[in-house]
């Protein structure tokens, strides 16, 4: 826990990268937050270690992006699903700077070489968009 907290202290930008799992963050990420973002570290008396840091969410989904795109919109909107993390950012004094997402990268699609190549290309594109967003912060 101390090593994770030290990494967070040294960071200006915190990127939480995860697959969307049943419309939420994975349980291991939730557990990590519960164990690392502790009273006295991230919040509460003396708990200002995350204050002023930028929080960027980077997520992937197995379902295609259009599944998460509201009618009439051009892009998916994960804000309602990520409201808990957005609230956690505010509670800890972090600045929430957005969500980078890529859909259609399910493990179940990795059965043929063409499908795997398409998923790898999506992953590369996601990584580049993430780099661009971080560079702009």
Residue ranges and their predicted role:
Residues 2-86:
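Helix-loop-strand module that forms the ligand-binding subsite of alpha/beta enzymes
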């Amino acid at each position: 826990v101390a090593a994770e907290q030290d990494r967070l202290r040294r960071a200006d930008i915190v990127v939480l990268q995860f697959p969307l799992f049943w419309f939420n963050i994975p349980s291991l990420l939730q557990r990590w937050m519960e164990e690392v973002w502790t009273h006295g570290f991230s919040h509460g008396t003396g708990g200002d270690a995350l204050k002023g840091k930028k929080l960027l969410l980077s997520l992937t989904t197995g379902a295609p992006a259009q599944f998460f795109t509201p009618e009439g919109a051009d892009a998916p909107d994960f804000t309602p699903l990520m409201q808990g993390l957005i609230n956690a950012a505010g509670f800890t004094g972090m600045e929430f700077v957005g969500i980078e997402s890529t859909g259609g990268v399910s493990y179940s699609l990795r059965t043929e070489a063409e499908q795997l190549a398409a998923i790898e290309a999506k992953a590369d594109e996601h990584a580049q968009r993430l780099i661009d967003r971080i560079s702009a912060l």
